[in-house]
């Protein structure tokens, strides 16, 4: 039996050729954590969790690696904020204004009048409450499909998720095997389901 050796690294790291060659030679592949590319709930300014614009920019530092050894991270969670607008600096830590939100937790908001506003530069959307005092930054089926198309076209080894249960629908009468809102989009696109 063959055992794989992998690692997960922040997209924010920078490598020179010597270090990249040493790392790539030590592992079968590298999972790049290409999410949490925002201030989340630890910083001071809310923005997109998984902006393609930011991902492309940060991946410039990874060009010293063979793309066929790199998997990019996809997120089925985001961040919820209240009392701030995207890009507005908070008076204190963002944890006082928001929280982590899973895709399953986010979905009921759409049935309660929340609206989507697509950001063409980031290639992902914000969602706003009816009174616009709350918003969520999160991927949706369209942005996930665009990301996996881009990953595949770009010659990367693949993708991975953070995290599996955040969009899971438990088995039921109409869904005997269970399903995933976002993960299944990627699985179908790659011809695995």
How would you name each of these model-derived features?
Residues 16, 169-170:
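Short secondary-structure boundary/hinge segments and terminal tails
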Residues 11-23, 138-152:
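Short, acidic/polar
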Residues 155:
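Conserved functional loop/turn residues at catalytic and ligand-binding sites
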């Amino acid at each position: 039996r063959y055992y794989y050796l992998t690692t997960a690294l922040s997209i924010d790291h920078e490598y020179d050729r010597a270090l990249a060659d040493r790392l790539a030679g030590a592992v079968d592949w590298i999972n790049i954590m290409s999410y949490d590319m925002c201030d989340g709930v630890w910083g001071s300014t809310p923005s997109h969790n998984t902006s393609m614009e930011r991902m492309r920019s940060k991946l410039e530092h990874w060009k010293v690696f063979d793309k066929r050894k790199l998997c990019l991270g996809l997120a089925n969670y985001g961040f919820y904020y209240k009392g701030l607008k995207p890009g507005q600096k908070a008076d204190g830590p963002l944890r006082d204004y928001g929280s982590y939100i899973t895709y399953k937790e986010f979905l009921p908001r759409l049935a309660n009048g929340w609206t989507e506003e697509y950001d063409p530069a980031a290639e992902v959307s914000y969602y706003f409450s009816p009174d616009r005092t709350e918003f969520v930054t999160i991927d949706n089926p369209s942005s996930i499909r665009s990301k996996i198309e881009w990953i595949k076209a770009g010659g990367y080894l693949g993708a991975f998720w953070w995290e599996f249960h955040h969009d899971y629908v438990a088995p039921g009468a109409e869904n005997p095997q269970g399903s995933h809102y976002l993960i299944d989009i990627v699985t179908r696109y790659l011809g695995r389901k």
